[in-house]
A protein has these predicted regions:
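Inter-Walker segment of RecA-like/P-loop motor cores
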Residues: 58-90
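Conserved strand-helix element at the start of the C-terminal RecA-like helicase core
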Residues: 38-47, 169-186, 191
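Post-DEXD/H (motif II) to motif III coupling segment of the RecA-like Helicase ATP-binding lobe
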Residues: 107-155
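Single conserved hydrophobic/aromatic residue that forms the stacking wall/gate
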Residues: 1-4, 8, 12, 190, ...
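Walker B catalytic acidic pair
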Residues: 100-102
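Walker A/P-loop
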Residues: 13-26
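Walker A/P-loop NTP-binding motif
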Residues: 25-37
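Loop/turn-to-beta-strand initiation segments
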Residues: 79, 93-96, 124-128
Length: 199
């Protein structure tokens, strides 16, 4: 794919690597709001929506846009854009641009979109890619001038052993590995737990 953005080599590009819960998204939000305009592409609609809500609370409803495959909220005065990666209006010029979970460039179904953003999407002043360390060598080959920072996990994640679903505490996570298992778990937990979110 040819480089669309004249991928300015003078644009400050960074890659922040680390596992979940290392403060990468919080850092990206702080960086974006320090610029006059910005855009962040998230891998999930729920992440775009959650961070859109946070930004609205900080800078106000009129300055923040939400663009996903399902909904578009774009005020006339919008300066900050929260999008799914596929829905990012990359032709729009912004000072800051960020793509979250950039390692999804290796995904068989959605990877082409993340790869396109990695190669072509740039902020005019700063570009930030967030992801796990598995993408590090690819970034170094494709973007040799990209500064790479690694972050440690802010809390511990540990296996608590086998638990009955009926005895789960609030804010527990259930991880399943197939679509049928997901729906079976959700239908069962709806009977025993008052609220549940499926991500």
């Amino acid at each position: 794919t040819p480089m669309r953005s004249s991928a300015a080599s003078d644009v400050y590009k960074r890659q922040i690597l680390g596992p979940t819960n290392t403060g990468k998204t919080f850092y990206a939000m702080e960086r974006m709001l320090s610029h006059a305009s910005g855009m962040i592409g998230f891998p999930l609609r729920l992440l775009a929506l959650e961070n859109y809500d946070k930004a609205v609370n900080v800078v106000g409803l009129n300055k923040v846009a939400l663009i996903t495959g399902e909904e578009k909220i774009i005020p006339k005065e919008a300066k900050y854009f929260f999008c799914t990666v596929e829905a990012m209006p990359v032709e729009k010029k912004v000072a800051f641009l960020c793509v979250d979970e950039i390692q999804l460039a290796s995904d068989l179904e959605r990877g082409y979109v993340f790869t396109d953003r990695l190669l072509n999407a740039r902020g005019e002043e700063e570009t930030l890619f967030l992801g796990s360390e598995i993408i590090k060598k690819i970034i170094q080959k494709l973007l040799p001038d990209c500064k790479i920072e690694t972050r440690p996990r802010l809390s511990t994640l540990s296996y608590a052993g086998v638990k009955k679903i009926t005895r789960l505490k609030e804010r527990s996570a259930i991880v399943t590995f197939s679509i049928p298992e997901i729906y079976r778990t959700v239908s069962y937990t709806h009977l025993t737990l008052p609220t549940i979110a499926l991500v």
